[in-house]
Amino acid sequence: SSDLTVSKFYEPGAFAEFFSGSFTFIADAIDSTPSKVDLLLECVQRDIPVISSMGTGNKLDPTYLAVEDISGTSVCPLARSVRKQLRAAGVKKGVTVVYSKEPVQRAEAGEVPGSMVFVPASAGLLMASYIVRQIIAENS
């Protein structure tokens, strides 16, 4: 919506400011690696179910998207960075992610990785589907 104004972004250490109360699930689509890792660590420490979207920049084929534990990811540079930082904090597995197995297409020097709307949108749909299926399974 053109009327929407984002006044705050999640930053490391801001969990309590953004999330009070209890949650059934958190869906993460943060682009900043330090903020993403902080949120994931907070969710793990608080035992809050979370699914995190990894990089969809410079991707063209949503059929390469997969839902897996962070420990099983490959190809995706963002997943590699997040996995390394989580491991350094003592978290080796237990964080579910959506990531692309599509071969990496490097952006030109100085360019921001672009994305086709259907790849991040498909990642979001996979996340939503995963959350709904987990809630149904938990309540069955």
What residue spans do the PLM features occupy?
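ADP-ribose/adenylate-binding Rossmann-like module
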Residues: F25-I70
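Residues at the C-termini of beta-strands that transition into short coil/loop
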Residues: F9, M54, K101
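Glycine-rich phosphate/adenylate-binding loop
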Residues: G21-S22, S32-S35, Q45, V50, ...
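Short, well-structured alpha-helical segments in soluble
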Residues: F15-G21
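Generic structural signal for helix capping and beta-alpha/helix-loop junctions
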Residues: G13, L60-D61, Q105-A107
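Hydrophobic/aromatic beta-strand patches that form the interior of the parallel beta-sheet core
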Residues: L4-V6, A27, I51, T96-V98
